[in-house]
Amino acid sequence: MSSYAYVTVIYGNNIYLTGALVLGYTLQQTNTKYDRVILATKDVSEEYRSYLKKYYTHIIDIDYVKVNEDIFLEENTRFHDVFTKLSCLSLTQYDKIILLDLDMIIAKNIDHLFKLSAPAACLKRFHIPYGQKIPPKMICSNGKLVGSINAGLMLLEPDKREWEDIKKDIVKENFIGKFKYPEQDYLSLRYCNKWTSITFNYNFQFGLTHRVKKYHYTIDNIYVIHFSSSYKPWNRLNSDKSLREDETDFFDQHIKYYNLWMNIYSKIKHDFSKNDIKLPY
């Protein structure tokens, strides 16, 4: 077992399986030296796990993590189970982990990120040079959030005591505040004076066109592509789901990124079909 690992999380049986396969496949293609771990809630079926084994070195069972509902700023939030992904902090067999969202493509090898001090992530809205400490004043002031990191890609150090403390914290009745992006805002505040900067080309959200233009990022000089909007690439695989006009416009505007994801997924389906295996999507 390596001292470092890439970690992602899958909840239940649903179309997010496609994201997990694309993420795992692209990680594998970068020839990383380190483990590729997927944490799976116990309602992920054996069938789905059999697909995931092709691209992940370890599949580890986890339980859903519940929180005090007062933590959510939006009543019908899509982030109800999002703190479950912080179960990765219990993986103390690793010195450091990189936690990744499923809606990502790893375009180039990123093993060098493990050399940074943890915790590390990309600061939203502002540029801090790679590897530098993010000034606390850009994240919090007087115990309140004024900025945030993006939690789609984070370098973390597993710590079971820290994880137990977080689990106690997020069920408190007198929780510190309401968050639109719950685990992201919570961790931003919790580690306000500890964050190291990972630059935008390691968490490339192509929908943020002002940042894309300002720093001249293109599909050729980025490491990780993040489909962070609600317009997920696998929506096009779901024939039962009709796209809204704004979704269609967004897809059309950023078609090269969605086509890249679709081409990778088509290759994955083809690889499985060689063994007479038909994926559910």
Curated annotation (Swiss-Prot):
Keywords assigned by UniProt, alphabetized: Membrane, Transmembrane, Transmembrane helix
One GO cellular-component annotation of the UniProt record comes to:
membrane
Q: Which organism is it from?
A: Acanthamoeba polyphaga mimivirus (APMV)
Could you give a GO molecular-function term held by this entry?
A: glycosyltransferase activity
Membrane topology is: Single-pass membrane protein
Compartmental location:
Membrane
Pfam families xref list: Glyco_transf_8 (PF01501)
Chief location: membrane
- The entry's protein name is Uncharacterized protein R707
Where would you find the membrane-spanning parts of this chain? 5-27
